[in-house]
């Protein structure tokens, strides 16, 4: 009897430790459903139906492994990826890494901020500039939670992630995608033409996010409670749950666009405003409103995460710290410039996702090197299959980027 009570008590304690350690992956996962994903997935679904769903599946599986490695680095070493690069690489390389990481973070934030502004515009009927002002105010308010510690922010961002997921369950109900072709698109790889490869690279850039590779290792480097092994096991569950939700949302975005647009003859839908206007008569006003609200939720939460990632990058690489409010104010400026110049915001979103894919390999290579170093990682060092899989992912990313460069120069993509 006593033995049974002790076992139950230790089991409850283990569950409490696991629950207490959950959260960082939900912050990282929000970067995987930002407005850039909306733009890229809608364009891919409208243009090619279900044919590129398999790209989302494989990109999400890659992202799961990458986020586990990033989180593991923080747990094993007590330092984030940027700090490890600073400690192990020559100063010129560190400065190069810092500059490119800041550019990637700014490109990401541009997509996220403008996406939220578009969402406010669609839902409230305000101008894009007014939507940008609302986005700025809302993100400042969310960032204020950071003063109370990491957990309150994790809960708010996790709640927004779940809201977007529920919103897309509703969108799937409205759009009613055909199961047979959807299943075929999930499991059979196909790239019909050069535009499909360009969009596939965009989907990859939208799904695997360089800035959250840096951020996740920072979120786990100060985790407390349980043994190191318990923290790692809890983190794997955290990543599995959060990234499964993010993967579902990305698949649902593309499937909804395919069902609502592609198979109703609207194959040219590549604009978030156009998607909203087209959804209303095709499905319903409610479906269009839910789309707009999910865009706001994704944009606000992901732009907050982008601001945090930028802070981690600066502190990690060059040991320089600026207040979060100042960073938020500075990184809003490119978005306002794009809006005031009247540039096509959706085109900016899609191009930013392609740009992001160029930063993936630069973050992945040192991550793989460090997590494969037994002296650094101890018993959490990568196994052989993880190392091989990681380098295959790097090869795929570099190959896609090479094709993009050649294709763009030759006018193929």
From Swiss-Prot:
Membrane spanning stretches: 19-39, 46-66, 94-114, 122-142, 156-176, 196-216, 241-261, 290-310, 329-349, 350-370, 392-412
GO term, biological process aspect, one: iron ion transmembrane transport
Recorded GO CC terms: plasma membrane
UniProt key word Transport: yes
Topology in the lipid bilayer: Multi-pass membrane protein
Alphabetical UniProt keywords: Cell inner membrane, Cell membrane, Ion transport, Membrane, Symport, Transmembrane, Transmembrane helix, Transport
Highest taxon listed in the record's lineage: Bacteria
Pfam families: Nramp
GO terms, molecular function: cadmium ion transmembrane transporter activity; manganese ion transmembrane transporter activity; metal ion binding; symporter activity
Ribosomal protein keyword on record: no
Subcellular location: Cell inner membrane
Family designation: Belongs to the NRAMP family.
Task performed by this protein: H(+)-stimulated, divalent metal cation uptake system.
Protein name per its UniProtKB record: Divalent metal cation transporter MntH
Organism of provenance: Klebsiella pneumoniae (strain 342)
